[in-house]
């Protein structure tokens, strides 16, 4: 009798273990399914529903607030060549501001009190954000080692995965098109590239690469709260490039192209050339 009782208890214990295992398996399945759901939701959250090349920005009412960021200046002269980069960017920014000031559709803004003052990129981005910008253009010049024949225009929009990437990419297309119409040769894929920093190493990536990466790009593009593009208007180390886009007349020519690109972005009619 005692033996039979022990066997019954063992049988019950065995049935209890099987039921518990089933519960654990069901809970595991639910947990894995829910985890996959969360992963898919996280992956798709914030992803663009329109392809970059088909994107068009939503335009509000003018006047539009345009931040013009003249690269370098003050204690940072930038690249040196046929011209000094900071002098070229200041001249271009000044000419672009003049066009925007005459056009009632725009309010030109800056990231520094003067072109001769020194400000870090993060400080310039903060100054831009404080002015509630609709668009930012950071003006720079390119350079190459002595003996290089490198020339041409290229620009860098905010990279894929960032909040303002598509608006930045659209603006970059307008800039590249306007510069090409002005006679510039376009570098890379249509004059548009991405930049990533891996520590102190800068990696250039063609705009055909759409993957989202964790590395940061240019600080001013990462930190500003609006579509933004950094433009390299010409190589300061190229006589031909500077004559066309970096000399006194060249800076004015570039500024006009930038102005027309801004007008194309906001779908306004440019003022006639003088």
Residue ranges and their predicted role:
Residues 1-19:
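N-terminal Lys/Arg-rich, disordered targeting/topogenic segments
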Residues 14-25, 33-58, 90-274:
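Active-site-proximal helix/loop segments of hydrolytic enzymes
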Residues 55-81, 137:
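Catalytic-core environment of secreted peptidases
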Residues 78-91:
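Glycine- and acidic-residue-enriched helix-capping/strand-helix junction motifs
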């Amino acid at each position: 009798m005692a033996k039979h009782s022990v066997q019954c208890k063992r049988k019950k214990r065995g049935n209890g273990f099987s039921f518990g295992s089933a519960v654990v398996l069901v809970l595991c399945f639910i947990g894995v399914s829910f985890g996959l759901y969360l992963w898919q939701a996280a992956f798709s959250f914030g992803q663009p529903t329109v392809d970059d090349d088909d994107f068009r920005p939503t335009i509000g009412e003018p006047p539009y607030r345009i931040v013009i960021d003249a690269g370098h200046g003050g204690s940072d002269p930038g690249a040196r060549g046929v011209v000094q980069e900071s002098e070229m960017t200041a001249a271009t920014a000044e000419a672009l501001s003049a066009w925007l000031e005459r056009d009632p559709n725009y309010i030109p803004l800056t990231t520094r009190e003067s072109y001769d003052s020194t400000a870090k990129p993060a400080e310039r981005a903060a100054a831009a954000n404080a002015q509630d910008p609709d668009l930012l253009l950071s003006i720079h010049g390119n350079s190459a080692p002595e003996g290089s024949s490198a020339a041409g225009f290229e620009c860098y929009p905010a990279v894929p995965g960032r909040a303002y990437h598509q608006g930045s990419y659209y603006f970059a297309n307008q800039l590249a098109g306007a510069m090409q119409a002005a006679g510039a040769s376009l570098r890379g894929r249509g004059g548009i590239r991405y930049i990533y920093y891996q520590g102190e190493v800068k990696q250039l990536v063609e705009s055909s690469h759409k993957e989202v990466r964790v590395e940061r790009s240019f600080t001013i593009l990462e930190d500003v709260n609006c579509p933004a593009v950094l433009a390299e208007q010409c190589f300061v180390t190229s006589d031909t490039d500077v004559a066309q886009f970096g000399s006194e007349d060249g800076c004015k020519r570039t500024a006009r192209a930038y102005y027309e690109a801004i007008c194309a972005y906001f779908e306004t009619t440019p003022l006639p050339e003088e």
